[in-house]
Amino acid sequence: MTSHSPKLTPMFEQYMNIKAEYPDALLFYRMGDFYELFFEDAEVAARELQIALTCRNPNAENKVPMCGVPHHSARSYISQLVDKGYKVAICEQMEDPREAKGLVKRGVIRVLTSGTALEDENLSPKAHTYLGALCWDKSEGAGGFAWVDFSTGEWSGLQSRKEQELWQWVQKMAPRELLLADTLTPPASLELTETQFSKVPERAYFDYKRSAEKIMSAQQVAELGALGLENRKELVRACGALLTYLSQTQKQDLNHLCQFKPLNLNRHLLLDEITERNLELFRRLDGRKGKGTLWHVLDHTVTPMGGRLLQERLKHPWREQAPIDETQEAVSHFFAHNTLRRQLREALDTVYDIERLSTRIFLNRATPRDYVALRQSLKALPAVRELLEAPQTGDGRYATPEEQLGAALPPFLHRMLKSWDDLADYHDLLEKALVDNPPHVITEGGLFRQGFHPALDELMDLSEHGASKLHDLLAEVQQTTGISKIKLGNNRVFGYYFEVPKSVSEELPDTFVRRQTLANAERYTSERLKELEEKLFSAADKRKTMELKLFQQLREHVAQARPRVLFMADLLATLDHWQGLAEAARHWNWVRPVLHDGQDIVIREGRHPVVEAVQGPAGFIPNDLRIDDQRRLLLITGPNMAGKSTVLRQAAIICILAQIGSFVPAREARIGLCDRIFSRVGASDNLAQGQSTFMVEMMETARILRQATRRSLVILDEIGRGTSTFDGLALAWAVVEELMKKQQAGIRTLFATHYHELTSLEGTIPGVHNMNIAIKEWGGEIVFLRRLVPGPSDRSYGVEVAKLAGVPQNVVQRARQILELLEQKSKADGTRRPASYHEAQPLLPGMPEPPSTASAEPPQTVTPPEPPVLTALRDLDTDNLTPLEALTVLTEWKTLWGAGKNEC
């Protein structure tokens, strides 16, 4: 609205005042049975929702764009907007319009954002939806990153002195919404296409003192140390920002949040986002989810909670032996007992997402159907318990009575059943209270069963059987008066009445009161008719009012069960996770691996689970692999398409599966526990940030060399490509040396390369061992055997692969001629490859000859003085150079060099 706009009506003045408080949100403004949007909000909503855009005051000079949606169907429209990244502020009528004096009071009751969604329409069932907050204090040289799944109440975080590490965790956790101080800018290299960034005032959101107070209040603790937050100032600030944002958007207490647990990196195998992407754990290399990922092969869970737990385990595998052993024991049990596993899957399949259901109930955001879903889920608890309690035999059968005498439950089941809670009291309450198919909206009524509440029963009887009660009263009057011609009627003026012909009207008792005289009839009422009429007219309203009151009481009672519900949700998720791993192992014919504290990794007939799932078992060639003290770095050579990358990836995936407690795709596996797995596989240009494949490769390699330890597993594929042959060879050589020098005995590494010169490192550098992917030549063609065998590959077969790829025959033939000439030349000169363009050029007819120097005098050899800029570069202390100082030095050099001055 501009300054010269006409005076606002009271309603628009109210709207504008509320809108001013939420300028970045679409304001859904309740007016009667509709939510209305005005001005720019209306234009955006109409465009995104494909609904009609109209205008208020169409005949006025200043028309107001508007659109609206019915309140009973607004949820789907709002969900669409939230999915598109919009914030939506819900402005409700805060009083009954019929009782309002003047303008109805209105206020925003909630702001919906992509990171605070509670509705199923905005949530992925088997994935967490995170709201994140990141802060970085340059003066302290430290920062914090915290995240919360508001739909379940789980939250965690970490603190680091490396800003890059924090952003790596942001990429790994991939929050739907990320809170950043308005002074902080994300790095240009950050790839988060599905994350919405929300800038907030640093002082209001990230203040340490306020954050500490909010955390202790929300978690009901007296000190931060109770949550593991002592001496973690930056993590406290990040957590405080989350709580501030949630309080402002949700407009209520945050008592549903679980106890905060800082992420303990020492307990988990660390997989950064780059490794997740290269190994295609959750997404394919093209960014798509589903088929072609490890998740698609592994996920056999049947509940949303079990699916989310599997995702969490796959993102954070265990590094400790104890939880791995317990998971393996459970998976082995369900793997061996097929009948139990099948029946358990059937029982769990009736369980809804009780984690998220309990959150919606606790926050008063649940619909009646959510309560019915909770009831249905609680009904499954005794059935699941009985399945687990039934003794099993070793061959997968239920034990006979005689066999049960010596049968004992596995320790993991005994511990679980000891704390089992059927929640029978809450199931029985919900069963007694709610009908089987209640309406979606509370205000529609018809929620409760007959017999739940006596007063409600009477109102239900009146509202549902009013017509029959009127008919019964009429029959009774006809019988007692003996006048069969009495009729029952109704109109807006007099309501219900008895109509009697004038000829018999005098026969009516005095208890009947005349209401209206017609030409041939008289209309009467009676005390009983008036009483019944009053009850009928008010029954529907009274029933809705009473149902609302009873429903609120039911909500408060069920909300108290949240801790018990969450405890059982965790048990059910764990059961589902275990049986899902067992189902996957049965389906794909996997085996139980042996994990140990040593360094050896021994895999017999290992398979890549995703490739095998696509090709089928018959089409996949398994491979053996061994890493030990004498074979720390396997140098794998062979042509493209032979399967080097598959061997690398499958080794890493088998280690990851083993450390979540899963069976693995192999005939046998012994895995020395890993602390980190690094993967540098595949080309990954980052053109948007001006980073070539080679630059990205070098950055990832540098990170690996800095962070890998003796307990890490590193897989590297084609290090050094993307630059000149000898540059690439030199870099690959140096990387191998560095990997074997680090951590005394070297880092466990699988190193695939086309640089055959590197094969000479076996015997030169302890721990380097040559392997190759076998090839067979047959009738001038090559056959990929897909077998990993000892020794180096004899050559790269690049021309043969080009032929298989469909390169035109004339190009292939010419390539063979050139290759033969190059090889002859290199043998004659005693070198592996031509050392320069001048050596290679005469072998390539059609290329211009280099300038002739035969008749020229031999050039005088003069050593020029070292340029001052090179001297300055050598003297530069890069370890202690600040970014500002570096920029200043570069500017000075550019000024000198750009001017063409000889002195530089």
From Swiss-Prot:
<dbReference type="InterPro" id="IPR005748">
    <property type="entry name" value="DNA_mismatch_repair_MutS"/>
</dbReference>
<dbReference type="InterPro" id="IPR007695">
    <property type="entry name" value="DNA_mismatch_repair_MutS-lik_N"/>
</dbReference>
<dbReference type="Pfam" id="PF05190">
    <property type="entry name" value="MutS_IV"/>
</dbReference>
<dbReference type="Pfam" id="PF05188">
    <property type="entry name" value="MutS_II"/>
</dbReference>
<dbReference type="InterPro" id="IPR045076">
    <property type="entry name" value="MutS"/>
</dbReference>
<dbReference type="InterPro" id="IPR027417">
    <property type="entry name" value="P-loop_NTPase"/>
</dbReference>
<dbReference type="InterPro" id="IPR016151">
    <property type="entry name" value="DNA_mismatch_repair_MutS_N"/>
</dbReference>
<keyword id="KW-0234">DNA repair</keyword>
<feature type="binding site">
    <location>
        <begin position="638"/>
        <end position="645"/>
    </location>
    <ligand>
        <name>ATP</name>
    </ligand>
</feature>
<feature type="region of interest" description="Disordered">
    <location>
        <begin position="825"/>
        <end position="869"/>
    </location>
</feature>
<dbReference type="GO" id="GO:0005829">
    <property type="term" value="C:cytosol"/>
</dbReference>
<dbReference type="Pfam" id="PF01624">
    <property type="entry name" value="MutS_I"/>
</dbReference>
<protein>
    <recommendedName>
        <fullName>DNA mismatch repair protein MutS</fullName>
    </recommendedName>
</protein>
<dbReference type="GO" id="GO:0006298">
    <property type="term" value="P:mismatch repair"/>
</dbReference>
<comment type="function">
    <text>This protein is involved in the repair of mismatches in DNA. It is possible that it carries out the mismatch recognition step. This protein has a weak ATPase activity.</text>
</comment>
<dbReference type="InterPro" id="IPR007860">
    <property type="entry name" value="DNA_mmatch_repair_MutS_con_dom"/>
</dbReference>
<keyword id="KW-0238">DNA-binding</keyword>
<keyword id="KW-0067">ATP-binding</keyword>
<dbReference type="InterPro" id="IPR017261">
    <property type="entry name" value="DNA_mismatch_repair_MutS/MSH"/>
</dbReference>
<dbReference type="GO" id="GO:0030983">
    <property type="term" value="F:mismatched DNA binding"/>
</dbReference>
<dbReference type="GO" id="GO:0140664">
    <property type="term" value="F:ATP-dependent DNA damage sensor activity"/>
</dbReference>
<dbReference type="InterPro" id="IPR007696">
    <property type="entry name" value="DNA_mismatch_repair_MutS_core"/>
</dbReference>
<dbReference type="InterPro" id="IPR007861">
    <property type="entry name" value="DNA_mismatch_repair_MutS_clamp"/>
</dbReference>
<dbReference type="InterPro" id="IPR036678">
    <property type="entry name" value="MutS_con_dom_sf"/>
</dbReference>
<dbReference type="Pfam" id="PF00488">
    <property type="entry name" value="MutS_V"/>
</dbReference>
<dbReference type="Pfam" id="PF05192">
    <property type="entry name" value="MutS_III"/>
</dbReference>
<dbReference type="InterPro" id="IPR036187">
    <property type="entry name" value="DNA_mismatch_repair_MutS_sf"/>
</dbReference>
<keyword id="KW-0227">DNA damage</keyword>
<comment type="similarity">
    <text>Belongs to the DNA mismatch repair MutS family.</text>
</comment>
<dbReference type="GO" id="GO:0003684">
    <property type="term" value="F:damaged DNA binding"/>
</dbReference>
<dbReference type="InterPro" id="IPR000432">
    <property type="entry name" value="DNA_mismatch_repair_MutS_C"/>
</dbReference>
<dbReference type="GO" id="GO:0005524">
    <property type="term" value="F:ATP binding"/>
</dbReference>
<keyword id="KW-0547">Nucleotide-binding</keyword>
